[in-house]
């Protein structure tokens, strides 16, 4: 059994951190350990073996020295980093005593940071585009603790995510002017005021609402009331929220980002960062989504994007990497 350290160094517990938490609580083939920033340690599952450290910058000599000392004490076989910062740090202090696996969670312009790792994992094929190195795609998965919804109410369309430009909520709001359905956007972030102004400018205050990010348990209530989930991202590695909705048998329409082209037919995909294309698709399908049978898509996601399937793929990747030493 190998000893594998996962390393995250974030100021907030968001998508990447949830991904890591689910790996650490659902992977049983090897011994897993977490090194993370002390400010987010309490958000991880209490069963996880956690080493808490203070956050530090990529160029901090003292921070790297302390981390290198901790890694030597743990003596791992593999260190698995998540995101560019931790990948850069490990690449700069790595020794021959362990292998380095790095996961790319989004679509990044600068991917050279990752190429010093022994293996690069992408959450979608698009996240790995331009990587000329040992790489493998292991898609995101639907949340392992989700329970199927029994009584759907179809009260509103739903969009979920950080209120940042990359999520394309400005494009979504602008595209909503001719749609009858109400839209609920759930998320927090720096774009909130701009988005609320856009709602006012387009006279959509009666139809479009923004609600602060909620915990997973409360989000289920919004899923239960949703007729459709909309992904409007300008770019994205692999939208987890789409997998969750499809597992819960909520129809999804999306921009062509991440793994969505593996899941949805072309007619339910709009060109990314194209407001006109998004509006055309929304006007065609949002108010009539109940006429489009996505049962085959629901079944595909439940089977192919389960956490059990992805943990087996991750275990295979670890074992293959170890066999090359």
Residue ranges of model-derived segments:
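Short hydrophobic beta-strand element within catalytic cores of glycosyltransferases
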Residues: 251-254
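Conserved acidic donor-binding segment of nucleotide-sugar-dependent glycosyltransferases
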Residues: 267-276, 283-289
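N-terminal strand-loop element at the rim of the active site
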Residues: 6-63, 70
């Amino acid at each position: 059994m190998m000893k594998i350290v996962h390393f995250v160094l974030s100021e907030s517990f968001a998508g990447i951190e949830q991904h890591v938490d689910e790996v650490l609580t659902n992977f049983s083939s090897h011994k897993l350990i977490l090194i993370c920033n002390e400010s987010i340690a309490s958000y991880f599952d209490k069963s996880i073996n956690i080493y808490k450290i203070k956050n530090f910058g990529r160029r901090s000599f003292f921070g790297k020295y302390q981390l290198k000392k901790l890694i030597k004490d743990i003596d791992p076989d593999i260190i698995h980093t998540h995101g560019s910062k931790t990948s850069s740090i490990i690449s700069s202090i790595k020794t021959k005593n362990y292998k380095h696996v790095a996961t790319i969670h989004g679509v990044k312009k600068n991917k050279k940071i990752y190429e010093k790792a022994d293996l690069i994992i992408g959450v979608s094929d698009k996240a790995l585009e331009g990587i000329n190195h040992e790489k493998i795609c292991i898609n995101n998965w639907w949340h392992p603790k989700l329970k199927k919804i029994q009584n759907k109410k179809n009260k509103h369309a739903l969009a979920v995510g950080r209120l940042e430009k990359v999520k394309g909520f400005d494009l979504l709001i602008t595209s909503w002017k001719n749609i009858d359905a109400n839209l609920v956007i759930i998320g927090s972030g720096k774009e909130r005021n701009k988005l609320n102004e856009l709602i006012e400018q387009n006279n959509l205050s009666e139809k479009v609402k923004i609600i602060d990010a909620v915990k997973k348990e409360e989000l289920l209530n919004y899923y239960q009331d949703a007729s459709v989930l909309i992904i409007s991202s300008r770019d994205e590695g692999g939208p987890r929220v789409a997998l969750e909705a499809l597992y819960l048998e909520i129809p999804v329409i999306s921009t062509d980002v991440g793994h969505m082209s593996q899941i949805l037919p072309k007619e339910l995909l709009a060109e990314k960062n194209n407001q006109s294309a998004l509006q055309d698709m929304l006007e065609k399908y949002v108010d009539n989504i109940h006429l489009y049978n996505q049962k085959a898509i629901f079944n595909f996601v439940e089977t192919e994007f389960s956490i059990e399937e992805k943990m087996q793929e991750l275990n295979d990747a670890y074992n293959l990497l170890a066999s090359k030493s």
